[in-house]
Amino acid sequence: MPTLLTIFGIRFFFYSREHEPIHVHVEHADGKAKFILGEDAVELVECKGLKTSTLKLAESILEENRIDFIAQWKATFNG
């Protein structure tokens, strides 16, 4: 379960046996979420228990790191 980044108590990761579309799981003490990382955007597809403020922060961090996270996904699964 490779961790891509942990910041502000939020962990961004994917599982070692993932499937497309490219996506990242997010965990925080509040709950969890899953985002698809597209070529141009980040899309929330699942959220359980995260506060709105935590969710918005996670989405912002994903937008800033989207290209790097996509590259790490591709290196892991297409590598």
State where each predicted segment sits.
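C-terminal structural segments of small proteins and small subunits
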Residues: 50-79
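Negatively charged, low-complexity tracts enriched in Asp/Glu with abundant Ser/Thr
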Residues: 1-12
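Generic preference for hydrophobic/aromatic residues in regular secondary structure cores
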Residues: 4, 42-46, 65
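A short, structured beta-strand/loop element
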Residues: 15-50
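Short non-domain terminal segments
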Residues: 10-12, 33, 67, 75
